[in-house]
Amino acid sequence: WLRDAKVEADRDARMQRINAGMQQLAGANHLSIVADKDLVAEVADLTEWPVPVLCEFAADYLRLPEEVIRITLKNHQRCFITHDADGRTSNRFFAVANIDSKDPSKVAEGNARVVNARLADAAFYFDRDPQESLEARVEKLNHIVFQEGLGTVGDQVMRLRSFMLDNAAAMGAQADVAQRAAYLCKSDLTTGLVREFPELQGTMGGTYALSGGETKDVAHAIALHYQGLPKDMDTAYGTRAVAAARGIAIAEAMDKLLGYFHLGRIPTASADPYALRRAAISLIHLLGSDATHIGLQPVEMSLGELIKQSSKQWNQQRITTSISADIQKQVRDFIVERLLGLSASLNCSRTAIEAAMESSTARPLYQLLEVARLLSDFSQSETGQAVAAANKRIANILKKSDAVQAGVNPDLFGEEAERKLFDALKAAEAAMPEQAGGMLTTLAGLREPVDRFFDDVMVMAEDDAVRVNRLALLTRLRALFLKLADISRL
């Protein structure tokens, strides 16, 4: 009886009505529907008896960027985009009525009227905005507050540009492209179209940059810097643009974290109004990917160095009191906390990440995660467990002893196991490769002489010179392991 009353209670059935109705009308009019499962589900939740209606906006508005049309139809009107027989965006679209109208043309006219009005506003700004170049608009950013106490968006742009000038190579980016894109990347905030459609930030910056004479690399970097790394390299952009966009996104996320932590706006368990957790997670994904699958060089900068370089930009501007060492540590700890929470999705264990982070080598994050993944697998092996146990024993012995500054004196060896371990240690030091997998293989090869040492040698000998010499041997051994990680944490 509900269906007799034009009410479909089954959500899946409502979704089926929407899809089937659109497909029927699209086929009859030589159109294809741009698939959007999320929008179908949303519209199904907004209607009781959904009836697709084919509508049409003025063809002149097809000159607008496709993203403007998409946002107008989908985001603002919950309508579906279509393509014509040649695969181009069509000026015909589907609205979904909540009634089986006796006169569908009236429904179509009403929807078209609303869409045409919004597109008319967009066209007005689209035609007017380019009268002022993005470079000329940079000065206007000095009148947009970034955050009270942190200066303006103009100040932020200068920090981003300076960061990219200093660090483009470490970001895997080309300096001229990266610094120019950073300089212009927020200028579209002053345009009428972005004020009307905030979702177009970046997208319109790229469009206006291209029409204003900037290179494709600069324009595409501006358009992409909000979006993160693509899953696959889109040939429409290219590596120079994507690398520059990645560098700007990294600089912006770190800039934001340092600024808000300086103000004391640190997220709590229940509130994160400035999306700082999201900024930290974005940083982890950008820094942690080696990106070779999309043709990019990885980011060759450690987390600590990134924090230092970003703090330098803040401190040079003197907008605030300097970003202190304590604030820098808080930001690092905050990012590391997020990193540990993501361990499973990064295909390694939490303890392996902690072990890798205790290395004496300051590695870029993508290399640190490579080490953590190796350690995760290694810790599951019998050799890995034995080496970890030996490292725990070494760490505990050294922790309870005074720091040893002396070198190892072979003349003080009283046991063959000492000499065997020392010879194996020297050989490992000489052969130690730079690549993490090779380092782990070399260190794992020390298992037998280390085990024999602990079986045959009393480290804490009564003779002071012998005891200190054995502690020096363990100190040197531990230092070698720490070049890779603190395996005692496994």
Q: Residues of each region from the PLM?
A:
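Amphipathic alpha-helical "coupling" segments that flank catalytic cores
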Residues: 1-490
